[in-house]
């Protein structure tokens, strides 16, 4: 009997049975009140307009922000879908999603947006972690209305609205009215890390990534700019880092492009912040400035060390090393312009110094500094990077090892990527924490390395349903209230040794949708099969909006696309 029930559950996975009495929204809002079963609907066309409250309409910057996002999120997608058929999951009516024909009780010509902040500083504040992103969305026979304290909340309301406007006979229909939605994020920090040091990305790919994140209410893009393989950040003070440390100069992220990208991200509600890893994962620095990385290549070759280039570490005895760290931490803070600079700190192997040709000089330098062990040397590097970041008025972010080894400043945000127990430990100790453990997008099932753990999805379907393991991963839920206050949120990590922009969206966004819902929606939204249907629909919408090209379906479905896709 148990086996039969499991087979039935797999047979119906990913179809419309799982979204009965739910709207086709992803991530799912905090509160949804709708008249399920009602045939009443609101009708709209691609000519629908925005009506802003005067407090935003009369401010040029606020008006520009909202106009840009209305055109990007509503006008353009509706124009592209005008003559398309609706998304479907089955030819069988009992398990297909609901057809959109209904009794039209109102034809909406406008979307009314009310900004409720007390002044323009409250309505349109600088984009930061912790700003008010809440909104309400009402669809009734009187019309469509979005209310929010800030423009960022209003923008998110537009993303929900475009998911509700389903094509039907050349127009758009919203059924189950009246609908009242109250929504806010569960977590403040809802991030995606991309690794451009292993495989590079075109500039247009970054824009599409931000648009895709914005569509599913993610708000932090973490760019891993350097590693052993390449150095992809343009430093004005040390230009040879990228001139010699990158394969092609046209893929290096120049400071002018980064500033444009950060500005674009801010328009879409996405913070863009940098990481340059130190003191390990730095072999590429040596291409531009020979000697700043300790030389253990003979040892790597003689010992046949796999991926040995990753363990090379900075040489403290070289006079340029700390000057470069100073410059990079300062430049990253200035160019990206937001609150955060990630200095890495992960996977340091002390053999990178003890096996190095420069080891005698390193020992001499340590003796002058009063550093007695190589563990203390590692701590010295970590503390030095943090001091430079804090001195420049920014907040350091680091990987978990810096905390685990006792060298994290209390102002530093700890990114837990491997040992999930450190999430509770660091948060209880008073550190701000972000969670990445279990959300590694380069792995099929991050929590199931042996593919036999009882908690894993059936490995026969490891590509079809690997998103479920990420969806179920929610250690934050188990923390007490006080500890949760120090968990800012989480980041899914796309380490890109086998990914570039040709397969990035297919590899990443199927499963990042599960993580995005886990970070945004209430912790009691837990049905992975419901998520699959809703995420499959949003994937279809993202293809139609022209920023998810290359992303495959989560499960069987029908998604008609414009001819230019």
From Swiss-Prot:
Gene Ontology BP term (one): N-glycan processing
InterPro entries, A to Z: Beta_hexosaminidase_sua/sub, Glyco_hydro_20_cat, Glycoside_hydrolase_SF, Hex-like_dom2, HEX_eukaryotic_N
E.C. designation(s): 3.2.1.52
GO cellular component: extracellular region; lysosome; membrane
Active site residues of this protein: 347
Position of the signal peptide: 1-13
Organism superkingdom: Eukaryota
GO molecular function per UniProt: beta-N-acetylhexosaminidase activity
Keyword Manganese belongs to the record: no
Catalyses which reaction(s): Hydrolysis of terminal non-reducing N-acetyl-D-hexosamine residues in N-acetyl-beta-D-hexosaminides
Enzyme class: hydrolase
Entries under Pfam families matching the protein: Glyco_hydro_20, Glycohydro_20b2
Major location category of this protein: cytoplasm
PTM entry text: Glycosylated.
Keywords in alphabetical order: Glycoprotein, Glycosidase, Hydrolase, Secreted, Signal
Location relative to the cell: Cytoplasmic granule; Secreted
Entries under PANTHER family matching the protein: BETA-HEXOSAMINIDASE, BETA-HEXOSAMINIDASE A
Function: Hydrolyzes the non-reducing end N-acetyl-D-hexosamine and/or sulfated N-acetyl-D-hexosamine of glycoconjugates. May contribute to amoebic pathogenicity and may be involved in the destruction of extracellular matrix components.
Membership in a protein family: Belongs to the glycosyl hydrolase 20 family.
Quaternary assembly: Heterodimer of one alpha subunit and one beta subunit.
Descriptive protein name: Beta-hexosaminidase subunit beta
Upper classification of the organism: Eukaryota, Amoebozoa, Evosea, Archamoebae, Mastigamoebida
Gene that specifies this protein: HEXB
